[in-house]
Amino acid sequence: MGVPRPLSVRSVLSLAALVAAVPAACAAPASGPAVQVRIDQLGFLPGAHKLALVEGGPARAFEVVDEGGQVVLRGTLPAAARWEASGSEAAVADLSALSVPGRYRLRVDGAVASDPFAVDPQAYAGLADAALKAFYFNRAGTALAPAHAGPYARPAGHPDTEVEIHPSAASPSHPAGSVVSAPKGWYDAGDYNKYVVNSGISTWTLLAAWEHYPEFFRGRDLGIPESGDAVPDILDEAWWNLEWMLAMQDAGDGGVWHKLTNLRFDGEVMPERATARRYMVGKGTAAALDFAAVMAIASRLYAPYEARFPGAPARMRAAAEAAWRWAQAHPDVAYRQPQDVHTGAYGDSRFDDEFAWAAAELYLLTGEAQYWRAFERHAADPGVPSWASVGALGWVSLAHH
């Protein structure tokens, strides 16, 4: 397959993201401004809501024609409404009744007003592939080969096999200055560091996408090194980060280090040229609970692939339960940025949402009543999820079951 342009991890938290609409100008009427149509450039799913924006001119009627020029849908535009943010007025053409796959054009007042657009069950398949491939481009600790990365091939950087324990992350089993290994994982959106808290919601997004739509993702070929093995590519990609996350747990007490970073951000250099000392920094309740939630759902979803990942489901379950126990014993440890550390903080001081999410995932994994009771104690009405607000993720997982 072709190599998509790399995107940041943060930009693809939702694999259902819409693309920007593109305008197409039709022939101008005898008087008045030219009409412009803004329509999804990738197309529409057959059963989906389908809208186009019509700007300019006193247009009133629209029709959709197929590739043979036959009119397949007619409609009347409502009055235009003004959107102050853009300073423009537009009317909305509702094309939702169009459900037969094919390629079409939208005409406004009899003039051809749009480039062809598609109605196709696979309209967003390429978008999903590109969004998933973005995670590959953000892999740490590995070279990106031309066969998989095309013009974005690069040497390996940040092996992270000798990471120093910062004083803020020290414990009896891992004193300050000792060294641990935590390779792989994904770089953050704008730097070469790796953070458990926001990495957690990114990994969960991939795992949830697989759980909700296995038939769609089972056949995707992302052109990553693991493509063609017996595991769906979306799970192979998530595993790259799960392996790193497992290394972020302090085996001595079950707590989870908040981040693996330099003391300061790297400059604008390629990964192999960024060679500053790397540190495990901090421990906190949010990191432990996000880790527990991700490991719990991963334990469930990788169980059918035990042959490819021997021992991993049991290991992830044990890791999730250990992190939960640590969080129960340390329920309010907020991450505080040490004075000598100047990378992303990703701090949080309210943990009900993390407790609810982790409890939901552990309940689905184990069926144990203690986790359901914990979910009931901590759950709130779901809001829009983000790295700092993850309560809705537990609701999503529970609703699916």
Put a short name on every predicted segment.
Residues 25-30:
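Boundary at the C-terminal end of the N-terminal hydrophobic targeting segment
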Residues 33-57:
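Contiguous beta-strand segments within globular domains
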